Amino acid sequence: ASAAVSAAPTEKEFPKTHSDVSSEQQNLKGQKGSNGGSMKLHTTDQSTFDIWRKKLQDLEFSSESPSKETSDSPWRSDILIDENCLLSPLAGEDDSFLLEGSSNEDCKPLLLPDAKPKIKDNGDLILPSPNSVPLPQVKTEKEDFIELCTPGVIKQEKLGPVYCQASFPGANIIGNKMSAISVHGVSTSGGQMYHYDMNTASLSQQQDQKPIFKVIPPIPVGSENWNRCQGSGDDSLTSLGTLNFSGRSVFSNGYSSPGMRPDVSSPPSSSSAATGPPPKLCLVCSDEASGCHYGVLTCGSCKVFFKRAVEGQH
């Protein structure tokens, strides 16, 4: 009894296979007349099975005789056949459908190139492509778009090193512009350049943008002036005069002062003649220095300032 109970749910859980149904169908054919009322449910199952078997046969013979299969199949209608059988789930293996699929394949390469230039026209910067062959035009549009972008990048890369190379007077890469900077360039406290023998206006404009780089190199010169001023008295003053003759007298804080040049008129603060050596300038106020006071080359008024500062600390 327990075995019969255990066998019952297995039959419910697992459906019958095709062989089981066929054997049961043969038994039903033999017992169809004897057991009328009890086998009535099985006859309905047999009828549904016959319908599905007939549909499978229709699908198997569809490749050989599609016209016969459409007339015999109850699942087909003329509307679905006229619509290329796209809505029928049983028409996937039809010859007529395959033939129409080949015709669709012939139409696909005609439709896809017509759709691609529309997308490229929207993506690119309004580049028309009205010709008959759109695929090479799409490639040329991409190349033209890249060529439009790359010259700007190359120009930006060229503009960057020009300023860096121009900051070093020793480099002769740029040519006349570099020689003009190294010979005639004089940095001032206002951050501007004296321009002499300039042929074009573009060079002078570029030199106006470069005094930021010109402020940095005179810093070691200022440290040499400071050390020589602390070292000895009059000898350091004469050495400072020779250093300032190059036109780059420097503050201690790194800002360059307007030095003396033989071809430039002397500033109003200097009282000496232009033919002699340039005056020694105060490192605080750029006035004419009176001497080295408290280790700093200053004028008379700044000497008092340093005196008060030093005495206030003591």
UniProtKB/Swiss-Prot annotation:
Regions that span the bilayer: none
Cross-link (Glycyl lysine isopeptide (Lys-Gly) (interchain with G-Cter in SUMO)): 139, 155
Cross-link Glycyl lysine isopeptide (Lys-Gly) (interchain with G-Cter in SUMO2) residue location(s): 120, 139, 155
Gene3D superfamilies xrefs: Erythroid Transcription Factor GATA-1, subunit A
GO cellular component: centrosome; chromosome; cytoplasm; mitochondrion; nuclear speck; nucleus; spindle
Keywords (A to Z) from UniProt: Chromatin regulator, Chromosome, Cytoplasm, Cytoskeleton, DNA-binding, Isopeptide bond, Lipid-binding, Metal-binding, Mitochondrion, Nucleus, Phosphoprotein, Receptor, Steroid-binding, Transcription, Transcription regulation, Ubl conjugation, Zinc, Zinc-finger
Cross-link (Glycyl lysine isopeptide (Lys-Gly) (interchain with G-Cter in ubiquitin)): 280
DNA-binding region listed in the record: 282-314
GO molecular function: DNA-binding transcription factor activity; nuclear glucocorticoid receptor activity; nuclear receptor activity; sequence-specific DNA binding; steroid binding; steroid hormone binding; zinc ion binding
PTM field: Acetylation by CLOCK reduces its binding to glucocorticoid response elements and its transcriptional activity. Increased proteasome-mediated degradation in response to glucocorticoids.
InterPro entries associated with the record: Glcrtcd_rcpt (IPR001409), Nuclear_hormone_rcpt_NR3 (IPR050200), Znf_hrmn_rcpt (IPR001628), Znf_NHR/GATA (IPR013088)
Record-listed Phosphoserine modification sites: 65, 73, 88, 129, 266
Main subcellular location of this protein, as a coarse class: cytoplasm
Function field: Receptor for glucocorticoids (GC). Has a dual mode of action: as a transcription factor that binds to glucocorticoid response elements (GRE), both for nuclear and mitochondrial DNA, and as a modulator of other transcription factors. Affects inflammatory responses, cellular proliferation and differentiation in target tissues. Involved in chromatin remodeling. Plays a role in rapid mRNA degradation by binding to the 5' UTR of target mRNAs and interacting with PNRC2 in a ligand-dependent manner which recruits the RNA helicase UPF1 and the mRNA-decapping enzyme DCP1A, leading to RNA decay.
Subunit and partners: Heteromultimeric cytoplasmic complex with HSP90AA1, HSPA1A/HSPA1B, and FKBP5 or another immunophilin such as PPID, STIP1, or the immunophilin homolog PPP5C. Upon ligand binding FKBP5 dissociates from the complex and FKBP4 takes its place, thereby linking the complex to dynein and mediating transport to the nucleus, where the complex dissociates. Probably forms a complex composed of chaperones HSP90 and HSP70, co-chaperones CDC37, PPP5C, TSC1 and client protein TSC2, CDK4, AKT, RAF1 and NR3C1; this complex does not contain co-chaperones STIP1/HOP and PTGES3/p23. Directly interacts with UNC45A.
Domain notes: Composed of three domains: a modulating N-terminal domain, a DNA-binding domain and a C-terminal ligand-binding domain. The ligand-binding domain is required for correct chromosome segregation during mitosis although ligand binding is not required.
Protein name per its UniProtKB record: Glucocorticoid receptor
The species this protein was found in: Ovis aries
